[in-house]
Regions:
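Generic beta-strand structural signal
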Residues: 24, 47-51
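Glycine-enriched alpha-helix->loop->beta-strand junction motifs that scaffold or abut catalytic
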Residues: 63-72
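Solvent-exposed alpha-helices and their adjacent loops that cap or buttress functional pockets
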Residues: 42-46, 65
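Residues that line or immediately flank small-molecule/substrate-binding pockets and catalytic motifs
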Residues: 21, 55, 75
Length: 146
């Protein structure tokens, strides 16, 4: 699949997952995805499972506030986390939801060592790898002075 229309793609993915969990037999015909007779082969433990969506940039964070139960941040500073939470709140309000109904969580990669330099060395490869694989996130890293 060509990765286009990320906002529409996210909306449809969340719709599809909710439909599968609720009914287990899904027909979905959207702008991005076209699914006929998807049948989940097992019964979910619950029909409603909170959906958290990973996002970094303002528009997608606002979409998280509109359609999910939580936004997952990654590799971010406290300043970015504060700004991200503000965008999630905007999205929640736009959808008529209370901002407090949408959680903001973060993946916090770290290295533990008795030696500070050794811990830094352990993080160099993951930081470089992430920056190399996800070019759009370089903008976030530069702004955060990583």
């Amino acid at each position: 699949l060509e990765f286009t229309k990320p906002v529409q793609r996210l909306r449809e993915c969340v719709d599809i997952v909710r439909g599968i969990l609720k009914d287990s037999d899904v027909n979905y015909h959207g702008e991005i995805y076209d699914i006929d007779r998807f049948d989940l082969w097992f019964e979910p433990l619950r029909k409603e499972i909170p959906i958290y969506v990973a996002a970094v940039f303002p528009k997608m964070l606002e979409i998280c506030g509109e359609i999910s139960q939580g936004a997952i941040l990654t590799w971010c500073t406290l300043d970015h986390a504060e700004s991200a939470a503000w965008h999630v709140d905007i999205g929640a309000r736009n959808a008529g939801r209370a901002p407090g109904d949408v959680e903001v969580a973060s993946l916090l990669p770290c290295a533990v060592s008795d030696n500070r330099e050794a811990a830094k060395d352990l993080m160099r490869q993951p930081i470089a790898s992430y920056a190399g694989r996800f070019p759009r996130y370089r903008q976030l890293r530069v702004h955060a002075v990583f």
